A protein has these predicted regions:
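Internal, glycine-rich beta/alpha segment that forms the wall or movable "lid"
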Residues: 1-59, 63-91, 145-147, 155
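Active-site mouth loops of central-metabolism enzymes
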Residues: 34-45, 99-100, 167-178
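Residue-level marker for beta-strand->alpha-helix junctions and adjacent short loops that shape enzyme
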Residues: 47, 67, 98-100, 206
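C-terminal amphipathic alpha-helical "assembly" element
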Residues: 54, 58, 64-78, 105-120, ...
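A generic structural motif
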Residues: 88-95, 126
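Short, conserved secondary-structure transition motifs
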Residues: 94-106
Length: 217
């Protein structure tokens, strides 16, 4: 809002000045008052994306994460923070965490496995799937290959079944109360180190949200 919106770049120009334009475009100044206190987040799990987010944004949504494996992110995030002269205290790592409370752990894991199989197996071409690469970086290389093979072959149920229990348990909160409470300790420890800022909890059960809130707040 400090001036008119003008830009001359390699791909884009404001106002548009192409040969097929009318030539009537004028740079405008916004009449709206921007709220600069609203934080800016990006969604990323790639090295370049994480570094860029740490440098330019206020936080990142890394889809899901294992709070014990900040080492997967650390080099990229540190690179971006250093470039911007920031620290982890200036940056929010906010993963999506699904919480499903129940005594049947396999039943609780099932919908999460289906979702993770979609990302690890089907989000992108065989040789260019960032989520598949991410699962490998977390230590599940063989499983990631198997999930992708099954998913791209149209065997979605088998792909979901191939998602390791350990991967679900590491990145989400599933099962009986005692199991969830125990796993929350790792998230607390990661929060104390600045490795996690906000947990974006997804839960269809009020009691699941209440459990997480009672332990974390």
């Amino acid at each position: 809002r400090e001036g008119k919106a003008e830009y001359e770049g390699y791909h884009y120009n404001l106002p548009y000045n192409g040969e097929d334009g009318t030539g009537l475009g004028k740079p405008l100044k916004s009449i709206l008052q921007a709220d600069t206190s609203i934080p800016i987040y990006t969604a990323s799990i790639t090295n370049t994306g994480l570094a860029t987010s740490a440098e330019l944004a206020d936080g990142v949504f890394p889809v899901w994460m294992n709070p014990d494996r900040y080492d997967v992110f650390e080099p990229s995030i540190s690179k971006g923070l250093q470039k911007a002269d920031k620290t982890l205290m200036d940056f929010d790592i906010a993963p999506f965490v699904t919480c499903i409370l129940g005594d049947d752990v396999d039943f609780c894991r099932a919908p999460i496995k289906a979702n993770m199989a979609l990302y690890i197996g089907g989000m992108g071409a065989r040789d260019k799937n960032f989520y598949n690469d991410y699962a490998k970086a977390l230590g599940y290389e063989d499983a990631a290959v198997k999930i992708q093979d099954l998913y791209l072959a149209g065997k979605k149920d088998e792909a979901a079944a191939a998602v390791p229990d350990e991967l679900v348990d590491a990145t989400h909160l599933v099962g009986p109360k005692e199991k969830i409470v125990e796993r929350l300790q790792a998230w607390k420890a990661a929060g104390d180190k600045g490795h996690v800022g906000n947990m974006l909890i997804g839960a269809g059960q009020p009691e699941a949200l209440e459990l997480v809130a009672s332990e974390m707040l």
